[in-house]
């Protein structure tokens, strides 16, 4: 699971207005496939790998920089991964398309809530936090949520094999 997160952090897909990684997709995927406890533990292991200096995060240098990188502008988003993984595994997604889509928007919001709070603390609340930390990613996030909504029930069925 943490290897999948690492790979998803390193692959950048051209998208408007900024390139997208598949990290948030994989975090939600892990929650749906593994359930809340295992997914949260998997994301926790991924974060620990980054904290000790392994180059697992998006844009982290080959040699990694551990705590220095972790406490940078993306720390809040990374912490939000834990909550997103937990709630993606906890909520019931065996419903209709619109409800699944709404629940996935809810679970991904933890990434942005924590990310924006940390960004505001780090760079100052007088800066355009939403324009820097949320708006550029909105279309890509909605695209990923749409894909996950379409395949959520199939992903959940993976739990029987894990």
Please report, for each region that a protein language model flagged, where it lies by residue.
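Membrane-embedded alpha-helical hairpins and interfacial helices in multi-pass inner-membrane proteins
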Residues: 94-162
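Hydrophobic transmembrane alpha-helices
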Residues: 1-42
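Alpha-helical transmembrane segments and their lipid-water interface positions
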Residues: 42-46, 53-57, 84, 88, ...
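Mid-bilayer segments of alpha-helical transmembrane spans in multi-pass integral membrane proteins
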Residues: 52, 73-82, 86, 90, ...
């Amino acid at each position: 699971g943490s290897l999948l997160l690492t790979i998803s952090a390193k692959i950048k897909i051209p998208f408007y207005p900024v390139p997208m990684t598949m990290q948030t997709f994989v975090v939600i995927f892990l929650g749906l496939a593994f359930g809340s406890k295992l997914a949260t533990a998997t994301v926790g292991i991924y974060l620990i790998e980054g904290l000790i200096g392994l180059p697992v995060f998006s844009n982290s240098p080959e040699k990694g920089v551990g705590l220095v990188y972790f406490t940078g502008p993306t720390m809040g988003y990374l912490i939000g991964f834990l909550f997103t993984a937990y709630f993606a595994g906890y909520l019931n997604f065996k419903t209709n398309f619109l409800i699944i889509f709404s629940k996935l928007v809810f679970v991904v919001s933890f990434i942005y809530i924590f990310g924006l709070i940390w960004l505001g603390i780090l760079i100052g609340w007088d800066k355009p936090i939403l324009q820097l930390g949320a708006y550029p990613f909105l279309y890509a996030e909605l695209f990923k949520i749409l894909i996950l909504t379409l395949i959520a029930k199939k992903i959940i069925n993976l739990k029987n094999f894990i």
